[in-house]
UniProtKB/Swiss-Prot annotation:
The keyword Ligase applies. Belongs to the class-II aminoacyl-tRNA synthetase family. ProS type 3 subfamily. Pfam families: HGTP_anticodon (PF03129), ProRS-C_1 (PF09180), tRNA-synt_2b (PF00587). It comes from Clostridium botulinum (strain Okra / Type B1). This is Proline--tRNA ligase. The gene is proS. Consists of three domains: the N-terminal catalytic domain, the anticodon-binding domain and the C-terminal extension. It is found in: Cytoplasm. GO terms for biological process: prolyl-tRNA aminoacylation. It comes from the Bacteria.
Length: 478
């Protein structure tokens, strides 16, 4: 029992060592484990089930929008990768190469896909001839490999799971609109499912995707004041279409190049959930994404009728929520701590006295508040409580983000804020890359995005003092 208790309680306080706190939760909540390959992880059932719920939401939305799922090869020939100059230069340092098949050296190196634009372009060039073939709306669920120097489970790994969408369109307007439609869907995923507020905006040219005309992003803020890029959507213009000779006959019979979009979310969203919502007791899962939304804990389960009533309750609730019954012989107190640590949104306690009174006790993971409900209406009450928990978690995350969002009007304010009050910094920018580079060099902060909702917090650039063009969210980031 002592060992069990230590397993539950031994989580490093986040204020003491945030990185170790994060690692403790990943391991103790059984989300992932380290593999024997540096930078690669084993996603355990608890972690993968969260990803499956993210998949379900995104896949359903994409199919509503008319997308189709496909599967592309894991390997890309070197000559294919070289076709788009900016793209290959952007990914070259992270590429893993296959040079041998068995004992035989390959005639041409094969890249293990870091992303699949080149493969989709090669395919689209073969199947598109006319404007009547457009748009092509493809998506794939797969893993990709990027040889990262510094890794951390879910946040930055050598191999990770994602969905990558690749679409081509007849016009620039249609493609740009589609890019923003997907970004908005990602925003809804974060807020409606993950209870995680985001800032929507456009990346600067320095931070945009290699080979893109425009990159749109959703940025979130973690407990420790660092930013995390939660999802991106790119408008690639005609750059890739021209590089790969994708052409179609337009409505006037003239040849033209389609406009390309690509976009993705990854398993780093699981890391974001941990760092936005978690506390010193462990993981705290938003109800709509939680693999198990409620756990039933029988109290004094050795007494007559308790387990039978708990089983009956499970059968009833299983029709409306994802529920688990823990009828193991561990003490109730240990179970409470374990499921708090694993982030189950709602605990349902039922014992002999509750059965006598035809009631159960609901305990929220987010604030530990207890509510007594009648067994006659428990299905409705549990569903209502899960919605209340989601809304409460979202509002709490918004409050934390807003409290850690600051304004700086000059470099002295910027440096003081980034060192002493980690978070988002709203500051004006002149548009000059040299200022962006200097801010990063001096403070370690990068431009996170130029928010769609622009405001003027100063007339001059925070760095050089010249006339400002855009409000930018800045921050140190994962």
């Amino acid at each position: 029992m002592a060992k069990d208790k230590k397993f539950v309680e031994d989580i490093t306080p986040m204020d003491e060592d945030f990185a170790q706190w994060y690692t403790d939760i990943v391991k103790k909540a059984e989300l992932a484990d380290y593999s024997s390959i540096r930078g690669c992880m084993i996603i355990r059932p608890n972690g993968y089930a969260i990803w499956e719920n993210i998949q379900k939401y995104v896949d359903t939305k994409l199919k509503e929008y008319g997308h189709e799922n496909v599967s592309m090869p894991i390997f890309i020939p070197e000559n294919l990768l070289q076709k788009e100059k900016d793209h290959v230069e952007g990914f070259a340092p992270e590429v893993a190469w296959v040079t041998h098949g068995g004992d035989d050296e390959l005639a041409e190196r094969l890249c293990v896909r870091p992303t699949s634009e080149t493969l989709f372009c090669e395919h689209y060039a073969k199947i598109v001839q006319s404007y009547k073939d457009l748009p092509k709306l493809y998506n794939q669920w797969c893993s990709v490999v990027r040889w990262e120097k510094t890794t951390r489970p879910f946040l930055r790994t050598t191999e990770f799971l994602w969905q990558e969408g690749h679409t081509i369109h007849e016009t620039k307007e249609e493609a740009e609109s589609h890019s923003l439609k997907i970004l908005n869907m990602y925003s809804r995923l974060c807020e409606d499912m993950l209870a995680m507020p985001v800032v929507m905006g456009k990346k600067t040219d320095k931070e945009k995707f290699a080979g893109a005309d425009d990159t749109y992003t959703i940025e979130s803020l973690m407990h420790d004041g660092k930013a995390l890029q939660a999802g991106t959507s790119h408008y690639l213009g005609q750059n890739f279409s021209k590089a790969f000779a994708i052409q179609f006959s337009d409505r006037n019979g003239k040849l033209d190049y389609p406009h390309y979009t690509t976009w993705a979310v990854t398993t780093r969203l699981i890391g974001a959930i941990i760092m936005v919502h978690g506390d010193n007791s462990g993981l705290k899962l938003p109800p709509r994404i939680a693999p198990t939304q409620a756990v039933i804990i029988p109290v004094a389960q050795h007494k007559e009728g308790v387990l039978e009533k708990a089983e009956e309750l499970k059968e009833r609730l299983a029709k409306v929520v994802r529920v688990k019954l823990d009828d193991s012989d561990k003490m109730p107190g240990w179970k409470y701590s374990e499921y708090e640590m694993k982030g189950i949104p709602l605990r349902i306690e039922i014992g002999p006295k509750d059965i006598e009174k035809n009631q159960a006790v609901l305990v929220r993971r987010d604030n530990r508040e207890k509510t007594i409900v009648s067994l006659d209406e428990i299905e409705i009450k549990v569903q209502e409580m899960l919605d209340i928990i989601h809304n409460s978690m979202l509002e709490e995350a918004k409050k934390t983000r807003d409290e850690k969002t600051y304004v700086a009007t000059n470099m002295e304010e910027f440096e003081d804020t980034i060192e002493n009050k980690p978070g988002f910094i709203k500051a004006m920018w002149c548009g000059d890359k040299a200022c962006e580079d200097k801010i990063r060099e001096v403070t370690g902060a990068t431009s996170r995005c130029m928010p769609f909702e622009q405001e003027v917090v100063s007339d001059t650039c925070v760095c050089c003092g010249k006339k400002a063009k855009n409000l930018v969210y800045w921050g140190r980031a994962y």
